[in-house]
A protein has these predicted regions:
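Conserved ABC ATPase "signature" region
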Residues: 92, 96, 103-121
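Single conserved hydrophobic/aromatic residue that forms the stacking wall/gate
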Residues: 1-5, 9
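Conserved ABC transporter NBD signature motif
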Residues: 52-63, 67-68
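Conserved ABC ATPase signature
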Residues: 125-129
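ABC transporter nucleotide-binding domain
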Residues: 167-254
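Catalytic Walker B motif of ABC-type/P-loop ATPase nucleotide-binding domains
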Residues: 150-153
């Protein structure tokens, strides 16, 4: 992406994005409204950049047209389906839209539904699937054409913790020999599987690199502090507080600060949640 930008509803939702991506998993992390979905729609040729360009193997994706979309798989945050179609028929419908030959589609659908553990539910109507099942069918349809680029927009939205873990493992399994871009506002979605992390704020990429490099770049330290309950609000006003664990004897605060917040504060290891809080000024959703 070279100086890529996009205006949505007369507001610049994406501004001056510059990055180079290769094979591997890229975690695009940011709060809601940061511009993640707009950027992904640009990468999937749904929205055309108002400025800059997006290249695939040195060629502009809008000029490549269908040749680019043939190597692209996309799972939007909300994807439509005919509720009365069963899983297999839905996959066949998407195969026909993608121009896949029927014999190949039959083999590919069986392979993918087995991979996402949905083959045994192939005759179940889409409207009768759980949220996790729908997401699994969603990633299967995105993989029908064996894409070199797989774009996943908030793929774990609405899933329970067990389904999120299962989905992360599936994404890691599918990432071999392809570029996977996964957007989320939940740190744990990418903490253990992303090769590189991209932090997006106010439509701009404010960091691109590994999790280890991100944590090493933090000048702030992370401290554990035991304080009386009636002092919690004072510390929250003065410091960036990540977690609060209350007990009968008071509260344990996880504080991000360059300086030791109190004499009894204990230094602890930084994690990606701390970096998220430092960059965005708010906590990620449930880990």
């Amino acid at each position: 992406l070279s100086s890529a930008a996009s205006d949505v509803y007369k507001r610049q939702a994406v501004r001056e994005v510059n990055c180079v991506m290769e094979q591997g998993i890229y975690g695009l992390l940011g709060v809601n409204g940061a511009g993640k979905t707009t950027l992904m729609r640009m990468l999937c040729t749904i929205i055309q950049p108002s400025e800059g360009e997006i290249l695939w193997n040195g060629k502009e994706i809008w000029k490549l047209g269908s040749a680019y979309r043939e190597v692209l798989g996309y799972l939007p945050q909300e994807f439509g389906y005919y509720p009365d179609l069963n899983v297999y028929d839905y996959m066949m419908y998407i195969s026909s839209i993608k121009g896949l030959k029927q014999a190949f589609a039959n083999r590919r659908i069986k392979q993918l539904l087995e991979q996402v553990d949905m083959w045994k539910f192939r005759k179940r109507k889409m409207k009768h699937l759980s949220g996790g099942m729908v997401r699994r069918v969603g990633i299967a349809q995105a993989m029908l054409n064996d894409p070199k680029i797989l774009v996943l927009d908030e793929p774990t939205a609405g899933l329970d913790p067990n389904e999120r873990i299962r989905f992360r493992n599936l994404i890691s399994e599918l990432s071999e020999n392809r570029l996977v871009l996964l957007s989320t506002h939940i740190v744990s979605d990418i903490e253990y599987i992303a090769n590189e992390i991209m932090l997006m704020k106010d439509g701009m990429l404010c960091y691109t690199g590994t999790a280890e490099e991100l944590l090493a770049s933090m000048q702030e330290h992370v401290w554990l502090c035991q304080v009386p309950r009636n002092m919690v609000e004072n510390y929250m006003r003065k410091y960036l507080v990540g977690n609060i664990k209350t007990s009968e004897n008071g509260a344990e605060l996880r504080i991000i600060s360059k300086e030791k917040p109190m004499a009894e504060a204990v230094l602890t290891e930084k994690n990606l949640e701390d970096a998220f809080l430092l960059y965005f000024g708010e906590k990620s959703e449930e880990r």
